[in-house]
């Protein structure tokens, strides 16, 4: 049985709750000692993992809608992407304010450049910012064919974000490996599209070099 438009609306409500409840839990944990011995790191990792969860969920929607024959499920993809951006912004903010501190924000640019894992993180965030800003139907109409070209960069985020997570932890544990594995799986489901994109980019680069 296919989802109806009304059911999709309720699904979106549930997804909003899924995006909001972790924030409420985090606020509670901060105020009631629910974090570990290093609360700053715990906050950074929690916000980063939550952003990654929404990224993977957004990437899951297209193959799920195709294989389950639920075309209306695509309507939830933008919502998941926006929650991914929101949590990624919280992740960046927690690093800037809690790790560096308000008095050392001038060091942020240097940190992002000199630490490779942070460089990957900020590249991912900038891409997510662009995708969030252009996610509306009006921007889709305005950008035309370039809209899809821009939003294909989500696949780059799906590569960079798990590497950023793996690189940021001092001891490799099953959790970051699990996220990386899921990202690889979701990208593998799109191997034909990704191969086509790669060949197109290679052809464009070759044509420019030939001029």
UniProtKB/Swiss-Prot annotation:
Q: Which family does it belong to?
A: Belongs to the MsrQ family.
> Where does this protein come from, organism-wise?
Escherichia coli O6:K15:H31 (strain 536 / UPEC)
The gene from which this protein is expressed is: msrQ
- Cross-referenced InterPro entries: Fe3_Rdtase_TM_dom (IPR013130), MsrQ-like (IPR022837)
Q: Where in the cell is it found?
A: Cell inner membrane
Q: What is the lineage of its organism?
A: Bacteria, Pseudomonadati, Pseudomonadota, Gammaproteobacteria, Enterobacterales
Q: Indicate what this protein is called per its UniProt record.
A: Protein-methionine-sulfoxide reductase heme-binding subunit MsrQ
Q: Which cofactor does it need?
A: FMN; heme b
Keywords in alphabetical order: Cell inner membrane, Cell membrane, Electron transport, Flavoprotein, FMN, Heme, Iron, Membrane, Metal-binding, Transmembrane, Transmembrane helix, Transport
Disulfide bond sites: none
């Amino acid at each position: 049985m296919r989802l109806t438009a009304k059911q999709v609306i309720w699904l979106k409500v549930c997804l909003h709750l899924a995006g909001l409840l972790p924030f409420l839990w985090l606020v509670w944990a901060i105020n009631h000692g629910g974090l570990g011995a290093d609360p700053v790191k715990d906050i950074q990792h929690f916000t980063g993992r939550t952003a990654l969860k929404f990224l993977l969920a957004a990437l899951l929607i297209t193959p799920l809608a195709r294989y389950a024959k639920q075309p209306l499920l695509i309507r939830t993809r933008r919502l998941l992407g926006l929650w991914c951006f929101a949590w990624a912004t919280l992740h960046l903010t927690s690093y800037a304010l809690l790790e560096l501190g308000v008095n050392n924000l001038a060091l942020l640019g240097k940190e992002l450049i000199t630490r490779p894992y942070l460089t990957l993180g900020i590249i991912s965030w900038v891409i997510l910012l662009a995708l969030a800003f252009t996610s509306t139907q009006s921007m889709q109409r305005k950008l035309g064919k370039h809209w899809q070209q821009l939003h294909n960069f989500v696949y780059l985020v799906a590569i960079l974000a798990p590497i950023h997570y793996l690189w940021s932890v001092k001891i490799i544990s099953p959790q970051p490996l699990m996220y990386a594995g899921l990202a690889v799986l979701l990208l593998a489901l799109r191997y034909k599209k990704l191969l086509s994109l790669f060949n197109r980019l290679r052809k464009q680069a070759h044509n420019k070099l030939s001029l």
